[in-house]
């Protein structure tokens, strides 16, 4: 009967012997399975150390092939390693962006200057640039190739610190500024001369005057520690700081005022400008309003912006002339080659 007693099972006498035989065969089958497994276990146990060793080797081989496959997909190269804590990225591309769409950039740090201050408009590529540097540093230290041109040089840091993005904490009731400052305090406690520090919108989220002053003081502290640092900002005070302090350099993300769109090109040695007045004029804001707005800005700032605008115009003109000269050089070389071929 069943365990509940509600059902009775009847076995005809004619199949009792066959059922007993079936039961015996099932038991024999189970015993044979256990015997075979025990024998196989014994065989495996005798070479267990070899199997475990091979497993480790296969894992390393799989990892190496995976890195190679990733390198091919990113069109990456093996960076030259240096011990001087220098970064020299040639046509570096953010590894997570479409390789056919991302704009390559030349980024260098540590040889002529230890701190790079990047300015420019929002959505111009500042954050992508500093993330590229941070990812390249971590990829290098992980034994990965980097998506850049041959001749790019990287180094190994004891730590790569980064404060990027706006991570407000509702649970801890932290504002944007407090959230950033909490991270920065932790970074300054741990930073050494062998560290790379990355700040995004340093000093943002509070009064601009106090924020700029704090940003300068923080950069000075990082410099005193001897670390390499890249920071993005909108503050003119930081541009002036980079212009006047040794081992600190300005950089800007290029913006095309005519098309009102960023080019995503990084220009090291050139302070960026907000382009707010030019953009507003292009969008139709009346000139007298723009002129009135300029009256509310410190005269020194206006003069600096005018100088930057002239520098940018001269740079663009020089870039165009250089491109034309290179094209002319190619045409001359082609004509010379054709002439030499005909003489032969």
Language-model regions, residue ranges each:
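Charged, amphipathic alpha-helical oligomerization/scaffolding segments
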Residues: 17, 21-24, 28, 53, ...
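ATPase nucleotide-binding head domains, primarily ABC-like/P-loop NTPase cores
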Residues: 82-314
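Short hinge/gating elements
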Residues: 3-7, 22, 37-47, 118-123, ...
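Charged, surface-exposed helical/loop "interaction arms" that form contiguous linear patches used
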Residues: 31-77
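Primarily heptad-repeat coiled-coil rod domains in cytosolic scaffolding/tethering proteins
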Residues: 6, 10-13, 42, 49, ...
């Amino acid at each position: 009967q069943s365990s509940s007693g509600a059902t009775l099972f009847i076995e005809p006498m004619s199949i009792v012997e066959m059922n007993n035989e079936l039961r015996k065969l099932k038991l024999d089958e189970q015993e044979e399975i256990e015997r075979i497994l025990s024998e196989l276990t014994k065989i495996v146990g005798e070479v267990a150390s070899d199997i475990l060793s091979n497993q480790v080797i296969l894992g390393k081989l799989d990892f190496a092939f995976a890195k190679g496959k990733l390198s091919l997909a990113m069109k990456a190269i093996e960076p030259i390693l240096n011990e001087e804590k220098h970064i020299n990225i040639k046509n570096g591309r953010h590894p997570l962006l479409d390789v056919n769409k991302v704009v390559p950039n030349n980024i260098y740090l540590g040889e002529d200057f230890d701190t790079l201050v990047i300015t420019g408009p929002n959505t111009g590529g500042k954050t992508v640039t500093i993330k590229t540097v941070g990812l390249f540093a971590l990829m290098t230290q992980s034994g990965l190739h980097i998506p850049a041109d041959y001749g790019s040089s990287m180094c190994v840091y004891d730590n790569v610190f980064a404060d990027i993005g706006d991570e407000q904490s509702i649970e801890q009731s932290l504002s944007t500024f407090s959230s950033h400052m909490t991270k920065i305090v932790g970074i300054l406690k741990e930073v050494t001369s062998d560290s790379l520090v990355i700040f995004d919108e340093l000093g943002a989220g509070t009064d601009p005057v106090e924020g700029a002053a704090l940003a300068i003081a923080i950069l000075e502290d990082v410099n005193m520690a001897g670390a390499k640092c890249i920071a993005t900002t909108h503050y003119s005070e930081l541009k002036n700081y980079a212009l006047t302090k040794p081992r600190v350099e300005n950089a800007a993300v290029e913006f095309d005022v005519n098309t009102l769109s960023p080019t995503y090109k990084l220009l090291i040695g050139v302070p960026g400008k907000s382009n707010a007045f030019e953009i507003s004029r292009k969008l139709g804001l009346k000139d007298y309003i723009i002129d009135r707005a300029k009256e509310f800005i410190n005269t020194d700032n206006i003069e600096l912006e005018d100088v930057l605008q002239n520098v940018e115009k001269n740079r663009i003109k020089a870039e165009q002339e250089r491109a034309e000269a290179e094209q002319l050089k190619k045409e001359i070389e082609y004509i010379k080659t054709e002439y030499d071929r005909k003489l032969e």
